[in-house]
A protein has these predicted regions:
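Phosphate/pyrophosphate-binding catalytic cores of soluble transferases and nucleic-acid-acting enzymes
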Residues: 1-313
Length: 313
């Protein structure tokens, strides 16, 4: 019989961490982060990383495992997450995977082929970046990541630039490496219960703005200044393209003033939440909860207790 695992998924700013920690108080679960920003050390305030006290009480696997200068892909995440899950299961406990990076959840559950299938969320993100910055800018990023592939693709060949960047981000490998072998995807060897947090859109928009203002008050811009002062980080690195960090970097370069920075960062975060919500509604076999309704924690607890069985509740 395959071991059990729980997925707690939701858009940004829906209180996933607090709910996951509360569930860890009630069940024999250990937490695994599914967040493409939380893997990076030094991305703390702007990534809404759990504070040190929370991490001491409820350790999260896959938090602070990479330097911001290092790449991290869906394939790397899958390997790391499986190792963490197997370790948790070996201790007789249940992995509870919590986060909002749909690309990572999908890679973990479905596996990755050598040439991964198109991912709608990632494709939309690349399209939005191209609309803002132009396809030549994305081609320049491809040239940095895979010079050989970029040399074969015209800067304005949107379809091929997009597909090349998708493949690299999904697999963590260059196209030439992907073409060398075509392994079949490996399915997740776990029985999974999916729980999705989908709040009222208007409330979430307000929470996103309030949370960003709290981040500013907590010193978010100083955090980005320290990252810039390292000297080895650039704006095109995946860590620095994270929502909020990209806009802060541009603001500190003088691209726009503080008011415009705040507006752009909040807008980008709301767009991220919209993409995450679209993914969560796109046919996932998940039970849906409103995280801002009274009784949400109790309802989540009931669902997990039913899945795990009375012996573990």
């Amino acid at each position: 019989m395959r071991p059990r695992a729980v997925f707690l998924m939701g858009p940004t700013a829906t209180g996933k961490t607090a709910l996951a920690c509360a569930l860890a108080e009630r069940f024999p679960v250990e937490l695994v982060s599914v967040d493409s920003a939380l893997v990076y050390r030094g991305l703390d305030i702007g990534a809404a990383k759990p504070d040190a006290a929370t991490l001491r009480r409820h350790p999260h696997a896959l938090v602070d495992i990479r330097d911001p200068a290092e790449p991290y892909s869906a394939a790397m995440f899958r390997e790391d997450a499986l190792a963490a899950m197997q370790s948790i299961s070996a201790r007789g406990r249940v992995p509870l995977l919590v986060g909002g990076t749909g690309l990572y959840f999908r890679a973990l559950e479905r596996g990755l082929a050598a040439m991964p299938a198109a991912d709608p969320e990632l494709r939309e993100r690349l399209r939005a970046q191209a609309e803002r910055d132009g396809w030549p800018a994305l081609h320049a990023r491809l040239a940095h990541l895979d010079p050989e592939a970029a040399a074969r693709i015209r800067p304005n060949d949107a379809q091929r630039v997009q597909r090349a960047l998708e493949a690299i981000e999904l697999s963590g490998r260059r196209l030439s490496e992907l073409h060398a072998g075509r392994a079949l995807p490996e399915r997740l060897p776990y029985r999974v219960r999916k729980l999705a947090l989908l709040p009222d859109r208007g409330i979430l928009r307000e929470r996103i703005a309030a949370r960003f203002d709290a981040m500013l008050a907590a010193g978010f811009l100083d955090e980005v200044r320290r990252l810039r002062e390292r000297g080895d980080l650039t704006a095109d690195l995946p860590a620095m393209r994270a929502v909020g960090y990209r806009q802060a970097w541009q603001h500190l370069e003088g691209a726009f003033d503080a008011g415009e920075f705040r507006a752009r960062a909040i807008h980008a975060t709301r767009q991220l939440a919209k993409r995450q919500t679209t993914w969560l509604r796109s046919g996932l076999d998940a039970r849906v909860f409103d995280p801002f309704r009274p009784g949400c924690l109790g309802a989540l607890s009931d669902a997990i207790a039913l899945f795990l069985g009375p012996a573990t509740a």
